[in-house]
Amino acid sequence: MKNIESTACVILNYNDADTTISLVRKIGDYKNIEHIVVVDNCSADHSLEKLEKISNEKVVVCQSPRNGGYGFGNNIGVQYAKEHYGAKYVLIANPDVEFEESLVSVLQNKMQQDRSIAVVSANQRGVDGQLKKSGWFLPGKAETILHGEVLCAILLDKIGGRKLGATPQSGWKFVDCVAGSLLMVDADVFLAAGGYDPEMFLYCEESTLGRKMMTLEKKTALYVSESYLHNHSVTISKSYNVKGQREQLLKSTLTYLKKYCDASKFEIHMASVLYKFGTLELMVIKEIKRLFRR
């Protein structure tokens, strides 16, 4: 095996400097990550001041010109890593994840061994130790529309999980999409594809990236023999309530349907109705849980 090409890690921060700093300190000594690029997505608090204090020869902190969301901010980070450090591989990490140095090596080696692969990741587990949705096949129009209603979403996720479960439970699986909480990309391919869609603020970026990779005839692979910890949505929850999250989800879903699924006006309308109904369902469920906790 020849030497691994340059690898950088991009961490996007928004109003959560303490979580971001904790991750930077944990991975700061990883020898297989040469540079860490922290992008502050125009936080509304004093995140930037805190983050600048951890800047050193390995860690650079930069600020996006505006809060353009997950995709916009990570695009800036990948571009910076490529232009300033010549990074071949970029590990995109949420601030609320934990992963071992050995996992980074596994991801690097896979990409270097198979140049047809442009995106890799591993299984993600929650703080409860349970396996979370880590990789999936590209959703079609019908699935995307129906996913707005809570019960349909649960059933569709179970069906999708069974499909992935039909393949071996160790080693590598080829999938269409991987979770955006932790993934490694080939920087050249990622940037050639235009990166994440900047019109999507918070959701659907994974499926959009999957479609872009398929268009370029590049593969996405998931390593299921190891996992990383994801304190799911701790950063998102600090910035958006349930209604706010659902509003962002609807906006991104409609963009995905229009730009990548050639959806009709009727299909767009149906998606809007189902997602708004799903929001009402979740708010009712939340209120019922609150009442029972009294």
PLM ranges: what are they?
Residues A17, D40-E49, R66:
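A conserved acidic beta->alpha catalytic loop
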Residues N15-D29:
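Short, well-formed alpha-helical segments that are part of the catalytic scaffolds
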Residues G86-E98:
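Short beta-strand-to-loop acidic/aromatic patch adjacent to the donor-nucleotide binding site
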Residues T208-R290:
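Active-site-adjacent helix/loop segment of glycosyltransferases
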